[in-house]
């Protein structure tokens, strides 16, 4: 049976959901093929969305028309701002989610979206003609024709689950691996490697002794992810903190020989920033304890996820380990921890649109590209979906720069550097993080969303008014000169503010931590009518004014540098500071400008600086 659509999406995880929904929203006829409709949107690992860097991604996905933020706001159990005591650039919103509610909400959204159809089957191979994808075949002899195909298979490509010595060919515990498609992708000549990730055991809530455990609350004023969320008054359940101890560690050490991670059974490389408990005990042998969070999986609190105890140790060892931990002495394990090893394609095989270089019309998103995490997957799925539609319409691709969004950092890192371990987003990966804050996501990306048809016109008009108000009032504050006159000192004293001893502008005054929004409105009458969103931006811009201006200068310099032409016949060999790999790639592709050089996989900003210097030196000589 042959069926046709504009875009096919393979896989109903977090990347597949965003790719399907955004493409349908932009007017394409989309068909989603997934192994099990009931697992669309399943949170396979921890019951949480967001965090440091990840919260930024979630909010960016939301502004650009994605669904993760609104689903989370409708299914959360606890909401917090991480790093709340630090600067706004490194704060991250995080929510514990009800895994059942999240999955049901996501599934219903997918099933009720116009232009989007869904079928339950397994994709087995791609149909390729003249190096262009034209469709797929499935395990029930269906053939689907499409102009674009987006693969979002997660950990299912040749997936193997490990629990102790036992191995099963699963893409997730109890679910079949996708072996035929994995073989097909290898046969097409893609550079395929193996990665490993893992998950933690879950225990029955009524078997935990919470007495004496540290209770972890949500924020009094809970943050939310989606700008569309109104009247937010969510459930706030507690999490609990406990710790491993020397007895726990000895049990694990005594069973290192039975751990797939150390026995050679697992070959794939695991996530650096989410190591298994056996890896932590091995690498940090001097530590006497490791922190664990007991997180409710649903509002019913019937199961708790033991965050920090990812493991693939044998079942009997997992029992001993858990029962050695305070509060879990009599815990009943409902689901054991396991490791999963799977195929991924080196993301250097992709362009910035997430289309493969080898096969036209084929896009990859999510863990197939070597990332880890729901948020990283959602961001890639969204971008693949948008770009697949734009390609259908013969319109220019949508590529976010590193100075525009964490999504830009994520994709640029993947396609230029590749990865040999599961890639996770952190704020430290963004060199322009002062400009890429959670609080200014709407102002950064609203114009893009509106242009793509992913933001309502009325809302965008209000956003533009706010943006203009921010710029105009910052200018006014810079021009507003304050002197230590009697009137100024009196007004500062009334606001319980320290006096000024010298001349200063309004921006410098508002840079004070103590000068809150209420004081801003009181001291500067022209700020009084402005809404909270505008005043918050003005406050942050004033506080970090010097650093923000410096980052804008660096961006301008980089933009100017990328316009520099590389002379015809330029010799790259022998330039100090250029690695052999960089020289080989530059000689092979012969870029005509530094911008073209920056698009080559493996060419770093440091390489561009060196090239810029030597082009300048050779021109002068």
Curated annotation (Swiss-Prot):
Coiled-coil residues are none
Q: Which cofactor does it need?
A: FAD
GO BP annotation list? tRNA methylation; tRNA wobble uridine modification
The UniProt GO MF terms for this protein read: flavin adenine dinucleotide binding
Give the quaternary structure: Homodimer. Heterotetramer of two MnmE and two MnmG subunits.
The record's function comment reads: NAD-binding protein involved in the addition of a carboxymethylaminomethyl (cmnm) group at the wobble position (U34) of certain tRNAs, forming tRNA-cmnm(5)s(2)U34.
**Similarity section:** Belongs to the MnmG family.
Specify the protein name.
tRNA uridine 5-carboxymethylaminomethyl modification enzyme MnmG
